[in-house]
């Protein structure tokens, strides 16, 4: 595999993994308010 392909896979993994975390943080902030 090329480094570019690996970099793209890592970027996609970070985006997919950070998605739910961001939603959870926003929900927590709204809950605290």
Curated annotation (Swiss-Prot):
Instruction: Please give the start and end residues of each transmembrane region.
Output: 5-25
Q: Name one GO cellular component term.
A: chloroplast thylakoid membrane
Membrane: is it a keyword of this entry?
yes
* InterPro entries for the chain: PSII_Ycf12_core-subunit
User: Which GO annotations describe the biological process of this protein?
Assistant: photosynthesis
Recite the UniProt keywords alphabetically.
Chloroplast, Membrane, Photosynthesis, Photosystem II, Plastid, Thylakoid, Transmembrane, Transmembrane helix
Entry keyword annotation includes Cytoplasm:
no
Where the protein is mainly located, per its record?
Answer: plastid
Protein's cellular compartments: Plastid, Chloroplast thylakoid membrane
How is it placed in the membrane, per its record? Single-pass membrane protein
Q: How does it assemble?
A: PSII is composed of 1 copy each of membrane proteins PsbA, PsbB, PsbC, PsbD, PsbE, PsbF, PsbH, PsbI, PsbJ, PsbK, PsbL, PsbM, PsbT, PsbX, PsbY, PsbZ, Psb30/Ycf12, peripheral proteins of the oxygen-evolving complex and a large number of cofactors. It forms dimeric complexes.
Function per UniProt: A core subunit of photosystem II (PSII), probably helps stabilize the reaction center.
The record's listing under HAMAP family reads: PSII_Psb30_Ycf12 (MF_01329)
Matches recorded under NCBIfam families: PRK13686.1
Q: Which family does it belong to?
A: Belongs to the Psb30/Ycf12 family.
Q: What is this protein called?
A: Photosystem II reaction center protein Psb30
Please report the organism this UniProt entry assigns to the protein.
Physcomitrium patens
Q: What is the lineage of its organism?
A: Eukaryota, Viridiplantae, Streptophyta, Embryophyta, Bryophyta
Gene (UniProt): psb30
């Amino acid at each position: 595999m090329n480094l570019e392909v690996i970099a793209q896979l890592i970027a996609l993994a970070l985006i997919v993994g950070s998605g739910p975390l961001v939603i959870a943080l926003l929900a927590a902030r709204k809950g605290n308010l």
